[in-house]
Amino acid sequence: MTKRICVSVDVEEDFPGLVKGGRRGVEEGIPELLRLLEDVHVPADFFFQSSIVTEHPDLVSRIAKAKHGIGNHGLNHAFLSTKPPAVQKEEIRRSTRILENAFPQEPRMFRAAGFSTNLVTLEILQDLGYAIDSSILPGRRAKRFRVLPAYDHRAAPRDPHFPVPSGDRSADTRLLEIPVTENPLRRGGPLGLGAINAYGFDKVVTAIHAVEERTLVFLVHPWELIDARAYYPKVPEGLLAACSGDLGAFREFLKAARAVAEFSTLPNVRRGFLGG
C-alpha cells in the first residue's frame, strides 16, 4: 500500500525557549518554502502561533490564497499539558478566535507547542469542535524544569486514531489524532526538514521505507529554513545542524519521495479514515 506524506509546518518564532522573539525563519524562510511548494506542486498544512498571525498579515494572506491547510499552534510556545484544564480551554479558545479573524475558513486542526498534549487537551479540542489533532509524537517524553513530567508519548499509537472515548458521538464529530512521525534516525525526534539538513535527503528517503506506518507527518519549522548560524551562533550545535538557508536538499527530497509515496494533507487523511 502506498505511503502518504503530509508536510506540516509549525509557523512559530525561532528556537522557542532559547531565542526571544526571533522571526527570521518566518520572515525569510516561509516565503521561500511557499515558492518551493508551489514549484513542486506539494500541499502543506500550516499551524500558526497566534502572535505570528497578528504580526504578519501579508504572510497569512499569501498562505490562505495558496489554499494550504490552516491549523492552530496555540497562543504561545509554552507547554499546554502542564496547565489546569480551565486555562488550557481559555487559551485554545483565544487562539482559535485569532485564527478565525485572520482566515476565511474556521481552524479545525491543532498542534500543541512542543507536542505538549494530554487527554484533557484532547477532550477540550473535541468539545470545541476541532476535527484533527497532530500533537502526539510517539517515542517522545518531556519534563518541565527537567524534573516534573510534562507528557509521555513513548507508548502512543503511531497511526491515526480516535484518542478520546466516543461517548455518544458519531465518528464524524470525533477528534482524530494524526501523530507526528518519529524519526528513525534519531528516536524521540520528529521526521522532518531538520533531519534532511542534518543527515542528507537520501538518508531521509531511506528512513521513509523504515517507517512502518502508512501515514507520515513530516514536520517543518521556520528556523530550519534559514542559515541560523548567522543569526543565532549561541544556539546549541545540534539544533544549528538542522538548519539551512539552501532548500536544494529539500527540493531533491520532495522529488525522490514522490517516487515512493504520495503527498497528502491532514484533512484528506481524516476523510480517508472516515471512509469518505
Question: Across the structure, where does each feature detected by a protein language model lie?
Answer:
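Active-site-adjacent pocket scaffolds in enzyme catalytic domains
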Residues: 105-214
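C-terminal domain-boundary segment and adjacent tail
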Residues: 36-44, 196-276
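N-terminal regions that are enriched for targeting/export leaders
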Residues: 1-35
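Short glycine-enriched, charge-decorated loop/helix-capping segments at active-site entrances
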Residues: 20-24, 85-86, 234-241
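Alpha-helical scaffolding within the catalytic cores
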Residues: 30-31, 53-64, 157-167
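A general structural detector for well-ordered alpha-helical segments in enzyme core domains, enriched
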Residues: 29-33, 59, 63, 91, ...
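Metal-dependent polysaccharide deacetylase catalytic core of the NodB/CE4 family, i.e.
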Residues: 3-4, 16, 40-121, 130-131, ...
